[in-house]
């Protein structure tokens, strides 16, 4: 296996290779550091690369391998989004208004370390993870490895660009309105938005008033499942807790799903949002593959409910809360300060009403799954946008732009149920497109099983972006 092939093998395979002593942790870290130095100047995926620290951790991991330790991610280099606390580093949050270095890891980072992973760097995001593109005044614009004139998506665009370009085995991500699924779709990756409460957000009991969850961007479905097995489970202080799975998620990735009823629809859940031809074609092609695999494919537009009256108050108030928590809020971008000002007008009573609406909306949307086991939609309604599309635009224009990207993603942040974005069978003008599989509440397992079956048929892990 040559160096390039090794860089793209992904999390699960690299963990197997380390256990079998086919490759050493030090070799993996050195490989990725060389690639980051050579390729990341074209992408701006990383806010900071932890070279010396990662090399030291790799040497420690080699000792653990030699001692026979069996940890699921032992010696595998991963990237973490720069809204997670990493002891000894500052958490940038895409902003010049950040505080100084923190003294302890977030719960997700602690669990990654416990599983044996090596943190190779922290990846970029838009300021406070607000928008579905990864561009900030403080840390620059993250570009798509498939076409560097296009966006990597957001807000987990740094992690997605890094994994897609073979700069890390996998990357952490978070999702308050599509921020895992959108960059996964833009960069040709698997993006698993977990069930609310599946992965602890501590030191925050919740984020954006229940909208945000944690997950990953990965090359394969098995990678996503192995990651989830390593980091999932409750922690003291969590507001939400997901029902435990019947079996490990990695086992679901290796188990066929059986024949499922799959509803497919390219109609936007949000009125007046245009769905472009490539997004419709991605759904059509995926439906054909699902049909060939023996599933019952139902072409029907589900009866959604418009979730914006629950989503928007929580999103805006969440931005205000995050801005209020920054040590130097005057250093926030003008657009962020404006959005935070709007959010501060939403009081506790308005928040309670938004959460009450969630319960009614969730009950109505649940009826969709009386007719199917899985719903398939586009992930985003258009191909990846141009980098800098919203430069100089005010908060209202940018928010409208975000709304035109997120109609298929925000409903599932309101309901809290899991969804996974996977690459469509074909590229469009050399760019990836994504489709989203949505499952019943607490049922990542069915989504993982079906997505792995699709992956085996479509073969997206073999694709390589031209940036290398």
What are the functions of these language-model segments?
Residues 104-235, 413-434:
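Short glycine/serine-rich loop segments
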Residues 21, 32, 75, 114, ...:
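Glycine-rich, small-residue loops and helix-cap segments
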Residues 1-55, 266, 292-294, 463-468:
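An N-terminal boundary/leader segment
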Residues 193-281, 449, 457-468:
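A short helix-breaking turn/cap at a secondary-structure junction
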Residues 54, 64-137:
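Acidic/His- and Gly-rich active-site-bordering loop/insert found
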Residues 22-30, 59, 248, 277-301, ...:
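Acyltransferase
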Residues 32, 54, 224, 262, ...:
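Residue-level signal for inorganic ion chemistry
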Residues 73-93, 251-267, 298, 316-366, ...:
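Short helix-loop capping/hinge segments that flank enzyme active sites or metal/cofactor-binding pockets
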